[in-house]
Amino acid sequence: MSAATTVLAQGAAQKITPPSIEYSSLSPMLILFGVALAGVLVDAFAPPKARRVLQPLLAGAGFIGAFVAVVLLHAHRQVLAAGAVAIDGPTLFLQGTILVFALLSVLLVAERRLDSSGGALVASAAVVPGSRGSTAQRTSPDVQTEAYPLMVFSVSGMLLFVASNNLLVMFVALEILSLPLYLLCGLARRRRLLSQEAAMKYFLLGAFSSAFFLYGVAFAYGYAGSVELGRVADAVGTVGQNDTYLYLSLALLGVGLFFKIGAAPFHSWTPDVYQGAPTPITAFMAAGTKVAAFGALLRVFYVAFGGMRWDWRPVIWAVAILTMVVGAVLALTQRDIKRMLAYSAVAHAGFLLVGMAGSNIDGLRGAMFYLVTYGFTTIAAFAVVSLVRTGDGEASDLSQWQGLGRTSPLLAGTFAFLLLALAGIPLTSGFTGKFAVFQAAIAGDATPLVVVALVCSAIAAFFYVRVIVLMFFSEPLADGPVVVTRPTLTFATVGIGALMTLLLGVAPQPLLDLATTAATSGFVR
């Protein structure tokens, strides 16, 4: 018998043990992957009229089912799938938050009464703007029902992103959540050129940031000999290791994650994409993507690089200050309501980084609570924007909102309340969210950072109040926009978002207790 045959015989005699996978602990993600595949089959084989009903129901049922699975896992705390996925308090809290925001976003996407031709999304992203096909597409009643499985795929990537305990798995999750969004951004029914430009910019810059992230993964492996977050943490500070690889890994991973949260100076995609994307997709990105990206950022910095927090804290300080200043100052110059809200999102990313700069349990709790408060408010705000329309689509220019408080006082009053919440006025969720992160920063000896945040909050309040003054203290335009009163789903979304903004402002303790429990349990590794 030859040597090769002997080796093969010995290998065949050995029992290969497959990895143990707790499928029940992965059920939220598995449910969504299954629903997304079912959505693809529905779109391929169901008739058009049936698709319009089945797809939103299927997506909504999937999000509800995944949320129930998250609730049932509340007591779980384990690393599974060969160390690739971590189920712990922060993971489950953030996954539940993402699913709630995704369900609200589905209501906006499913709305067909806003536009005379149908929903906010069209049936094809590749039609040349200004062409005969583009004109026909704008007035066609066809609905892009593929948007629903794309959304479900993206949300499943978000759930995996916040649960990843392995940098390569985190990269895969990043691509799963990002690729559907690139396409969804280009599906706006109106202003096709702006929408396609947004999709292209988001794709190119997103691919660029993903390359940075992947390069950071390579350096982490070169330093620690592993891409598992726990093993990277064990290698930090080890004698004889090449710290150059460690710092390069931290910097490159940070660039990739700062891009996803829209932090300066990696925020340049945010205003263009928020403005050009269909407003339901903008709301979905503004809330869901920010939660997922911050969840991954917190896990990477707290788990893998927690042992060198004194090295990365100054970087967080600098990025937080730059992000708050850029977001607040540039929002002052905007004349488009969606671009203004985009720069507001940049500023809020800076406020979230203030809590992270505390690098303590209070910072983790404050950041998670802030993400919930911000998400409800911003989804409701973009839903209001979609209701104010002209004959050419949404009235996004600020001058068109002049006198809206006199023609539609209820809607204008709701929008004013949401803007005040974003500004952080007491008795709103914005105030309690900022209080939570600022308190954590002070406890973590970052008081100067809180002072800068308060100054930027005052600057930000100016452009919020400017819109309120324009709506209530200006004469309405003769040919001004109208408020569409038929969209039941959109009004329901506005109502839910505004109600949660109020409840989390006057009675935040139940959610704070939930965030405290999740943060105290900590990250597993």
Curated annotation (Swiss-Prot):
Source superkingdom:
Bacteria
State its location(s): Cell membrane
Reaction(s) this enzyme catalyzes, per UniProt: a quinone + NADH + 5 H(+)(in) = a quinol + NAD(+) + 4 H(+)(out)
Extract one GO cellular component term from the record. Answer: plasma membrane
Main localisation: membrane
InterPro entries assigned: NADH-Q_OxRdtase_suN/2, ND/Mrp_TM
Q: Which UniProt keywords apply?
A: Cell membrane, Membrane, NAD, Quinone, Translocase, Transmembrane, Transmembrane helix, Transport
- Mode of membrane association: Multi-pass membrane protein
List residues traversing the bilayer.
26-46, 53-73, 90-110, 143-163, 167-187, 202-222, 246-266, 278-298, 314-334, 341-361, 368-388, 411-431, 449-469, 487-507
One Gene Ontology term from the biological process aspect of the record? ATP synthesis coupled electron transport
What are the protein's GO molecular function terms? NADH dehydrogenase (ubiquinone) activity; NADH:ubiquinone reductase (non-electrogenic) activity; quinone binding
Q: Look up the EC number in the record and give it.
A: 7.1.1.-
Q: How does it assemble?
A: NDH-1 is composed of 14 different subunits. Subunits NuoA, H, J, K, L, M, N constitute the membrane sector of the complex.
Q: Which family does it belong to?
A: Belongs to the complex I subunit 2 family.
> NCBIfam families annotated for this entry?
NDH_I_N, PRK05777.1-4
Function noted in UniProt: NDH-1 shuttles electrons from NADH, via FMN and iron-sulfur (Fe-S) centers, to quinones in the respiratory chain. The immediate electron acceptor for the enzyme in this species is believed to be a menaquinone. Couples the redox reaction to proton translocation (for every two electrons transferred, four hydrogen ions are translocated across the cytoplasmic membrane), and thus conserves the redox energy in a proton gradient.
Name the record gives this protein: NADH-quinone oxidoreductase subunit N
